[in-house]
Amino acid sequence: MNLDTYNYKTHESILGFEFYSEGPNGRVKKIVRFSPQHSNGITYFNLTFGDWNENNNQIDDRAITNNQDRNKILATIASIVLDFTSHFPDVIIYAKGSTPARTRLYQISLAVNWQEIDRMLFVYGFRDWNWHHFQKKHTI
């Protein structure tokens, strides 16, 4: 995908990435982490994303930075997912917004860039208690 992204740094384990959002509210450290999970004999990675909270050394996935760089942040996360899958090509990644509004934002971003994404990744959504191949005309 040919979108404007932030430079990011990979942590040693390749399971963590960091970059900085820059805008009217300053420079804010963002973290993307892939955490291995196991369910019903399947291993997958949960994608966690948010602002780094220096006070408690945790990712805050409900923070609102308002740096007017949402699309650049989402493109950076997409680039990180592609980087991660280049190291683990057959991996399953689970991602869900921390709020319904964020989940919807991610769905819209997938739909807008669907032509390119569909060539690179298999994307599924969970709807009506089943997994379905993502289709840009449906909400999940």
Go through each PLM region and give its residues:
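Non-catalytic substrate-recognition and accessory regions of acyl/acetyltransferase enzymes
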Residues: 1-140
